[in-house]
Swiss-Prot record:
This is UPF0390 protein zgc136864. It comes from the Eukaryota. Residues 1-38, 63-98 are annotated as: Disordered. It holds the Pfam family DUF2462. Residues 83-98 have a biased composition (Low complexity). Belongs to the UPF0390 family. Residues 1-30 have a biased composition (Basic residues).
Length: 98
């Protein structure tokens, strides 16, 4: 017989199967990796602010052009921001179903 202790312990069959992780599918949506440098964070804030400002300006110009082309005044309605607790659109009134 060989001297010294055994190199490997005896393993139970199926013991390794418990720890297997199945690969999960990809999640939807874009992913943004948070930067670690303060300068990059500042650049991203500036970029986002500029994008919002440009989008708002374009929307304003479009509404101005649309209101001048119509014979009556165009009113733009904005929906109030919803709380995070109330997700989704309000449910319609329940009517008699057949």
């Amino acid at each position: 017989m060989a001297q010294g202790k055994q190199k490997f312990k005896a393993q139970r069959p199926g013991g390794a199967k418990k720890h297997q992780n199945k690969p999960k599918g990809l999640k939807k949506g874009g992913r943004i990796i948070a930067p670690k440098k303060a300068q990059v964070v500042q650049q991203q804030k500036l970029k986002k602010g500029l994008e919002v400002a440009i989008r708002n300006k374009i929307e304003h110009e479009v509404t101005q052009k649309a209101s001048t082309s119509l014979h009556k005044k165009l009113s733009v309605l904005k929906t109030p921001a919803q709380k995070s607790g109330t997700a989704g659109a309000p449910k319609p009134a329940a009517g008699p179903s057949k």
